Every structure is written in C-alpha cells, then in structure tokens.
Amino acid sequence: MSAEILRVHPDEPQPDRIDYIVSCLRKGDIVALPTDTFYGLAVDPVNLYAVEGIYRLKTRQKHKPLSLLISSVAQAYELARDTDSLLDKLADRFWPGPLTIIVRAGTKLPLRSTANTGNVALRVPDAAIPRAVVERFGLPITATAANLQGASECTHAACVRDQIGDRIPLIIDGGPTGRSLPTTIVDLSLGEGRWEILREGAIPTHEIVMVLQR
C-alpha cells in the first residue's frame, strides 16, 4: 500500500491538517515530514513500538539514538538533566535552526528512546510544520532522515515517496526544504563544562567555537 500524501502549507500549516498528523502519531504511525534541513521520520518517542518501527525501516544500529525535534528551549529543559550555561549559549544563538545538541536525558523519556545511552539529541527546527506538530502533540517527535540507509537524504516529498512510500502510511508534502546540508551536532553530555563537535553541518565549526568560548 502506498503512503498517503498530505499537502501542508510550509509557512502557515493548516490547523486541521496538523490535528490529523498528531492523530496519526498518537496511533503509533510513522510520518515523514519536512524540516529545515531534510525530510524526517516522526514518531512518538515514548511509544517504543513506533520507535522500533523506525529502527527496522532504517536498519539502524540499535546503539544509535534518534534525535528529537522540540518547539522551545523550555521543552529542552523538561527533557534534559544536569544542563549548564552552554545549552543556553547555543540555543540563544542557533535555535531555531540546524543545530542538534546532545544532553543528558531526564526521566520523561524511556531509556530505550535514548538507545540505552542516557543521552538525548534535541533541536528546535526553523520550520513551521514540525514545530506546529510538536506544539499540538505536546511531546517531542523523532527526526531521523526519511531515507533508506545508504541512500541520499530527501529535500522534497517525491524523494521520500520514491524511497519508502510503500513502507510508511503518511508523507507530509510541505514543499522543498530550505537546506541541503545536515545539522551540526554538538555534544554537551560530557559534563563539567566540556563539549565536543561531533559533526560539522549547516553551521560551521568556527561559529560554534566562538559562541562556546565567550
């Protein structure tokens, strides 16, 4: 069975369509939707059946946690523990935007949702559709790239349809995404004010360093 394609306005998402997306997430469905980098696969991160579905679809190694999209810095503090001023510095400068920040996970997320690492990767996207979904859902959503392992990331809905349209129930067509580079990833879970840039992406390394060394 082919996925349903649902067109949603990229800048002013229709509330009834956001409600429909949320209802699918609450059922445990996998939903492909646009972010500000690539199309991602969204599920309810506390629904372990749905989380396992993404790992099966992507043939993703079980020790690799899924990143989560959130709607605000306040939500990051609800999901994290043992945070420090580095999170504020990065969030103030780069959120919403293509920066993923790894922090120690709090108790609101099942350990399996962190791939048993105890850490969680968070991001506030600069894209209206996923932020509207998170706000309406009341929980973060997963955001792993909507592509098969080894295939190119998707910047438009047709690419998602061609790669995995027969394996997921719903694809949100919000037009092309704004960037063709992945997020930059910074690990703040090390504690004691330590940090590490794990991947340089849309935000150059030197910009991250400038902010963190202030």
Show the residue positions of the predicted features:
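Active-site-adjacent structural elements in enzyme catalytic cores
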Residues: 1-214
